[in-house]
Amino acid sequence: QGVRVRSHSSNLQSDSFAAIGAMPLSVAWGDTYTSLQQHTIDAVSGTTLTNMYGGKFYEQVKYITMTNHHFIPSLVVMNEDLWNSLSSEDQEIVQKAFNEAVVYQREIAFEYAETYKNNIVDSGVEIIDVDTAEWAEAMSSVYDKYVGTVGIDADMITRIQEAEAALQ
């Protein structure tokens, strides 16, 4: 309650933080470290352990709470004309290489995250894993407010929640 958390200038994100009792403050990403250092904010959201370690944010905090509420997708795109100019065999080769690269990238990302997590813990920061069910319940009003306004309908939210539950 009352934790000042760095937020994007997004009503959706601000409402999400408010729903769990936090005080969202819009802070530019480049000002995040200094804002933690000067106690303008108490927390940073939406960052990975890679960013936490690389940005040295762990130097300014005592705790990291693993909420897993953000997922940062990476995209590979190709010009449609270029794709269509490839033979079906070449398209198959490109798709296979992409699929293999995705698996490899995920493996490497998890390895780096584990290394960074260990380094952060070794620096004296306590990492806390939380049961996010309470947070998800608090977010229901946010889902209700934004469903249909950001390109996601109620059915999509239900499917995401079901997929998430299956992973637990």
Specify the residue positions occupied by each region the protein language model found.
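N-terminal secretory/targeting leader peptides
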Residues: 1-168
